[in-house]
A protein has these predicted regions:
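Short alpha-helix
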Residues: 44-67
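Conserved SAM-binding loop
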Residues: 1-34
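A C-terminal cap/extension of S-adenosyl-L-methionine-dependent methyltransferases
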Residues: 64-123
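Conserved class I S-adenosyl-L-methionine
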Residues: 24-51
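Aromatic-acidic/polar surface patches that form glycan- and anion
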Residues: 5, 45, 108
Length: 123
């Protein structure tokens, strides 16, 4: 729970990449954009499931930052969120939704409180 406080996320991710060994696992846990934790006054960034694509996808045309491979995205639910099962949703209907819990979070808020990104360093 540090990344959302950083002044320059791009520079910090480059530095993490620089000091890490090849194939190192980088785990970043941040508040989910639709939770109340995301809106603390000292937070500089908001994160959703697509936020780390800047650092993992080579086909971005407006900003290229190869060097990480996304291993896993874990949505950490609130107490209420645990009541909704993480059943997969059809990709053709909801291309940016990971599961039913994620969909309900868009609709109701406060279902997901944090996102856990796990990425491998590629050198």
């Amino acid at each position: 729970d540090v990344v959302e406080h950083l002044k320059d996320l791009m520079k910090s991710m480059k530095e993490i990449h620089r000091v890490s060994r090849n194939n190192a696992l980088v785990q970043i846990i941040v508040p989910y954009w639709h939770s109340s934790e995301a809106f603390y006054p000292d937070h500089k960034y908001f994160f959703n499931t697509d936020s780390m694509r800047f650092f993992t996808e080579k086909d971005r045309t407006y900003y290229s930052f190869p060097g990480y491979k996304m291993e896993k995205i874990v949505l950490i639910p609130s107490r209420l969120g645990w009541l909704i099962p993480p059943i997969p949703t059809p990709g053709f209907l909801f291309p940016n939704v990971l599961n039913l819990r994620h969909l309900f979070s868009y609709l109701l808020g406060q279902i997901i409180v944090k996102i856990d990104f796990r990425m491998r360093v590629i050198k």
